[in-house]
Regions:
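Compact, glycine-rich, soluble single-domain proteins
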Residues: 7-57, 65-66, 88
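C-terminal structural segments of small proteins and small subunits
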Residues: 56-89
């Protein structure tokens, strides 16, 4: 199992489009992927769950990934978040 804290750096935080990109990417992996913020833990493959986290810019989320492709999943999701979900700001 891998765990990592990641800061949300894009201007609008985990809004609908960013949440959709995250859940779409998470769905490509067989591993179980969980995101936690403020003691709320949600399945990263659920767009409604991810949006309910209401993670704004500067928020820290905790990623927990467990499964055969956990390393690849962690690298891909961390890169997506660091790249501001491809939004450029």
């Amino acid at each position: 199992m891998l765990q990592q804290d990641i800061e949300i750096v894009n201007k609008l935080g985990l809004h609908a489009r960013a949440s959709a990109k995250l859940t779409q990417m998470a769905g490509q992996f067989a591993s179980e992927i969980w995101i936690e913020r403020n003691e709320r833990r949600v399945n990263a493959k659920s767009i409604m769950g991810v949006m309910m986290l209401a993670a704004n810019k500067g928020s820290t989320i905790h990623l927990e990934i467990d499964g055969a492709d956990e390393n690849e999943a962690m690298q891909a999701l961390a890169a997506l978040i660091a790249d501001r979900f491809g939004e450029g700001e």
